[in-house]
Structure formats: structure tokens, C-alpha cells
Amino acid sequence: MSYEIITYDPDTGTDEHGDYRTQREARQGLKLYRQEPAALIYDLDRWRIVYRRGYWPAGALPIERGCNA
């Protein structure tokens, strides 16, 4: 499995950070982005959001498998 951290700022939009092998590594890496208004951990293999914090407008969220786009 691989995970990615995606952050969101209303002024700059979304930004992708790193590739992590485990969800635990991704949660540790997320601590680096505490100052960001919103952040999430995205499972790249299953196309699912596994953790989300902060406000995300609908257009800024990544696509999830099994959800209507």
C-alpha cells in the first residue's frame, strides 16, 4: 500500500506531499503540516481518503473509488 498527504489552503489550493508506505508513516509525516488549514491522507491503491481534518470544498477533494464524481 502507499499513501499520500494532500494539504489545502484557500489561497494556494491543494498540494501533494510525499509517498508513504504505511498509514502510520503518513500520520507521522502529517505532523509537518500542522500549520495548513486542511490536510488529508489518501490511500493511492484503494483511491480512498483514510484521514481528513479541516474544511475541504467539494471541488478540492480527490476522487474516491465507488463515489459519484
Residue positions per predicted region:
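Acidic interaction surfaces
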Residues: 8-23, 63-68
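Short, flexible N-terminal segments of the mature chain
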Residues: 17-35
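Short aromatic-glycine-(Arg/Gly/Cys) micro-motifs in beta-strand/loop hairpins
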Residues: 1-16, 43-44, 49, 57
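Short, mixed-charge low-complexity intrinsically disordered segments
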Residues: 33-69
